Amino acid sequence: MTAMAVSGKLLTALVLSTYILGLALTIQATQYEEDKYQENEVKYGRELASWLAQLAHKNEPAICAHKRNSEIINSLLGLPKLLNDAGRK
C-alpha cells in the first residue's frame, strides 16, 4: 500500500470518529435539554390545572365551613341515632 492510501484511510477513520463523537454529544445535550424543559412543563401543568379548577369552582358556594375532624366524626356517628329518632315520630 502506498503512503497516500494509508493516510486516506486514517483521514477517513478520523473524520468518521469525529462525526460519531459529535453525534453522541449532540444526542446527550438534546436529551438533557428535553429533561430540563419537561420538569418545567410538569410544574406549569400543575399550576394550570390548579388555576382551571379555581376558575371552574369560582361561582359555586363554599361547601361548608372548615370543621375539625372530631366534629365531622361526631356528626357522622350521630347520624344513625338521628334517623332512628326521626322514624319513631
UniProtKB/Swiss-Prot annotation:
The species this protein was found in: Romalea microptera
Entry keyword set: Amidation, Cleavage on pair of basic residues, Hormone, Secreted, Signal
Any GO BP annotation: response to light stimulus
Record-stated family: Belongs to the arthropod PDH family.
Gene Ontology molecular-function annotations: hormone activity
Keyword Ribonucleoprotein tagged: no
UniProt subcellular location: Secreted
Modified residues annotated as Alanine amide in this record: A86
UniProt protein name: Pigment-dispersing hormone peptides
Keyword Signal tagged: yes
Cellular component annotations (GO), alphabetically ordered: extracellular region
Superkingdom of the organism of origin: Eukaryota
Major localisation: secreted
Signal peptide range in chain numbering: 1-22
Function per UniProt: Capable of inducing pigment dispersion in the chromatophores of the fiddler crab Uca pugilator.
